[in-house]
From Swiss-Prot:
Lineage of the species this protein comes from: Bacteria, Bacillati, Bacillota, Bacilli, Bacillales
Protein name: Pyridoxal 5'-phosphate synthase subunit PdxS
Keywords, comma-separated and alphabetical: Lyase, Pyridoxal phosphate, Schiff base
InterPro entries xref list: Aldolase_TIM, PdxS/SNZ, PdxS/SNZ_N, RibuloseP-bd_barrel
GO biological process, one term: amino acid metabolic process
CDD domains xrefs: pdxS
Quaternary organization: In the presence of PdxT, forms a dodecamer of heterodimers.
Amino acid sequence: MSKIVGSDKVKRGMAEMQKGGVIMDVVNAEQAKIAEAAGAVAVMALERVPSDIRAAGGVARMADPRIVEEVMNAVSIPVMAKGRIGHITEARVLEAMGVDYIDESEVLTPADEEFHLKKDEFTVPFVCGCRDLGEAARRIGEGAAMLRTKGEPGTGNIVEAVRHLRKVNAQVRKLTVMNDDEIMTEAKLLGAPYEVLKEIKALGKLPVVNFAAGGVATPADAALMMELGADGVFVGSGIFKSESPEKFAKAIVQATTHYQDYKLIGELSKELGAAMKGLDINKLSLEERMQERGW
């Protein structure tokens, strides 16, 4: 029996519907309900938030399907779930469960260090991380319907997400003034599919939404990423590792929506309690940096 494959247009359209919103990591039904009540446009169901995955070490895998099912049954908003890079079976299991999106995620331990998933062979849309236009174009070429910055997950440190978003946007701007000969050379330099780069030039932007992720910990962090051109925000550990998850969740959603209302952001940031404890990126070894996973 042949597989039913969703079209790029449909998958990208589904992701476009989340634009301007916040997607929150949750580990149980209770957290999912808090996220939905705060105004999250979707939730990411996983066994442990990135900061706990980082602290535990070892091999991080797809969440217990029971956790994913509990979250799916608890909320009416879309539910995403993470699978390991290159792990075909984890992705097929999540697709069979009926999740709305799969995140082929560097937060989990990669199953394949050479190949990412062929995402255009799935019906369910995929979201993937990127640090630059080469990574973005390769994931789009494989069928990703949504992108996000890799940032540095589980650190509460926004600096890498800022770096990645600025780099992608700068490379897109550069591409828009190139002729076809130059685009072919750029494709070679970036290791990117030529046709994807031509599509980006024609549109003047990425053909899929690109959210900020990896280090968002405060309302101001979320607003900053929107200011820099993100289409929305993922918050991993920043909500439920803070002192007041409900307050942080609501404040981050409002700051994302009203990211240029600086007076409001100041008000939203008052008396929230302590944000999650942050990590200095410079003190992480190359092996400890999740953003280095994938290619």
